[in-house]
Amino acid sequence: PGKRIIGERAFDGAPGLRLALALPPIEVAVTARLTDGDTVEFEIPVPDVEAAFVLKMLARTVRDSERDLQDIETLLEIVASQPDYHASPWRLGDPKITKAGERGDAARVAAQMISSPPTRVPARVRALLRRHVAIVSR
């Protein structure tokens, strides 16, 4: 875990990537305008909300980024809004699911965040974690 330097580039470890690649993605249609004015249209797969959440939660085990915390809050707000466009259902609220594996690892990070002081994790994020992630005691 942590940053690795390969060549002249720094890379963070990517715990949770296996889950993100295993779950069905959300297909996003993109129309990009090029600098010459032409447009290119394509579809790109992005991780589903749950897979992205697990990635971001597990990223906190190797780095402490304000951006990751903002992304976690955004993903939880999406879950709270109950959108129809999930590629797969949100399962992190089920204690049977959060007992093991990458989802379990993410739930353990959530438990740490919930018990963090408000100066580290905002109250809204802690409330959303309590509401949407089943914390299983070991």
PLM segments and residue spans:
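Compositionally biased terminal segments of proteins
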Residues: P1-R138
